Structures are given as structure tokens and as C-alpha cells.
């Protein structure tokens, strides 16, 4: 895992040429980050969804102009929860038709963030932090790691 991670971090090919690298990921997200105040862009962060799923769902519905009857919220929030999404992975995981996952439920893994910290040594983490600092402004880097706009 370490070598694959460092290849992902260190790849210097143009972001549009390499679809799976830190540079391409940051390049992709930076466009949305720059437009985050536009009406047609809504940024959601997994950590924020974990902390307040219902609040984030209500925020999204509000931004999209969707009126949800109050009595429907508990059902919607339950359906969008991690355990329920994982239980229904064959319809909720992305690209279920192509079977890119060994198991669709595996897409949902453990439902936690920061698992990579336990897999990487200090040198690999330092390389990641340095490369991210080259690629992303501090506010985007902070949001990528912690969420909350």
C-alpha cells in the first residue's frame, strides 16, 4: 500500500493526463472549491455528513429548492445512513454495474475517516503533506482533511 500511495502522491504528469493521482484529484476538486459560493455548486464532506447527516441533508435540500415534508425526514435520514447504505450496497455503491469492487459493500469499508494514518509511516505522510501544500491552497487542504465550510 505504501508504494502505491507514494506513486499517487508523487505523480507529476499533468492532472488531465493521469486520472488517479493526488494532482488530478486536487485539480478536479479545486474547480469546485473556487466556485463553492455559486448557487449551482454544493460541497459535501464525509466528516460533516457523519457529524450531522440530517443537517447536511436539509442544507442540500434547501440549496436545491426541494421541499421535504417534515414527517419524511426520519425515513430519508435513516436510508442515507452508513449502515443502511452499506446494507443496500448493490444499489447504493457507485459503478455497481461494472463490478469494480470485489464487493459492493466493500466500497463502504468501515465508515470512518483517516484510516490511512494507520497504514503509512511518518515519511510517507510528510511527503503527502508537502505535495498537497504544493497543489492546494491552505483553505482547500484544510477542508479536504476536516470538512466544514
Regions found by a protein language model. Name each.
Residues 116-117:
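Globin-like tetrapyrrole-binding proteins
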Residues 111:
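Conserved active-site carboxylates
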Residues 1-78, 82-107, 126, 134:
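PAPS-dependent sulfotransferase catalytic domain
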Amino acid at each position: 500500500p505504501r508504494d502505491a500511495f507514494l506513486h499517487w502522491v508523487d505523480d507529476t504528469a499533468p492532472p488531465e493526463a493521469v486520472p488517479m493521482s493526488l494532482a488530478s484529484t486536487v485539480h478536479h476538486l479545486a474547480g469546485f472549491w473556487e466556485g463553492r459560493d455559486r448557487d449551482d455548486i454544493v460541497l459535501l464532506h464525509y466528516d460533516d455528513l457523519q457529524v450531522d447527516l440530517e443537517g447536511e441533508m436539509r442544507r442540500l435540500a434547501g440549496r436545491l429548492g426541494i421541499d421535504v415534508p417534515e414527517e419524511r425526514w426520519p425515513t430519508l435520514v435513516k436510508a442515507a445512513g452508513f449502515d443502511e447504505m452499506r446494507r443496500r450496497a448493490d444499489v447504493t455503491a457507485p459503478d455497481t454495474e461494472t463490478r469494480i469492487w470485489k464487493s459492493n459493500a466493500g466500497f463502504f469499508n468501515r465508515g470512518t475517516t483517516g484510516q490511512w494514518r494507520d497504514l503509512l509511516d511518518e515519511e510517507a505522510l510528510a511527503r503527502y503533506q508537502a505535495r498537497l501544500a504544493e497543489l492546494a491552497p491552505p483553505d482547500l487542504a484544510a477542508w479536504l482533511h476536516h470538512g466544514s465550510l
